[in-house]
Amino acid sequence: MIKSKFFCKSLKFFMHPYSKIKNEKSFIDLNFIKGYSNFIKKKCVPYDKKKYIFCNKNRLISNVGNKINKKESEEQYDSDDDNDKLVLNDDEDDEKKQVHINNKTEATNITNINKNIENIKNDMSNLNNMNDSNQKIKMKNKGKYDSDVIIMYDHFFQLPQNFLSSKLSEEEIEYINTGIYNPDFDNYINNIVMKKKK
């Protein structure tokens, strides 16, 4: 067959919006030819009713055309005798192979999980060490105008009740430093900034 000789086994879907094929489709089912995917000049040859192949313009067109013609002639002269034959014990071998393959994949999955757990533990210890050093650097790089206490002014009747305090808590200060959007809290901060500018 052509597939075993010229094509990769896996089918790939390819978006082809500017195709020059007579029956233009957005998705074309393609089989890429091994060793011929890097050629510049390519031609799209119909393989089946819904499948097309790209091949080099000069090579393989005669081979592909001959193989397609042979395939069509074989399909015409095939009889139903092959379909009528009964195959015994064919499923049992397949089931044994499948169980064996499943056992192998489960074993490899378990070993991969164990390796991943060990890697995560090592990464966590490395991250803790890195975080400690980063915190020391951040404390050293703190600007002279940065403060942990924000002075509140009077007349905050527009603010929610839970924000009314003389000093901000540590959580509120961390929230301000992260810069995450929160409309109520942003109004609160804007009022403080506007009061300081006056």
UniProtKB/Swiss-Prot annotation:
Which biotechnological applications are listed for this entry?
Answer: Possible candidate for an effective malaria vaccine as determined by epitope response in sera.
The coiled-coil segments of this chain are 106-136
Q: Where is the composition biased (Acidic residues)?
A: 75-94
Keyword vocabulary terms for this entry: Coiled coil, Merozoite
Q: Where is this region: Disordered?
A: 72-95
The protein here is known as Uncharacterized protein PF3D7_1409200
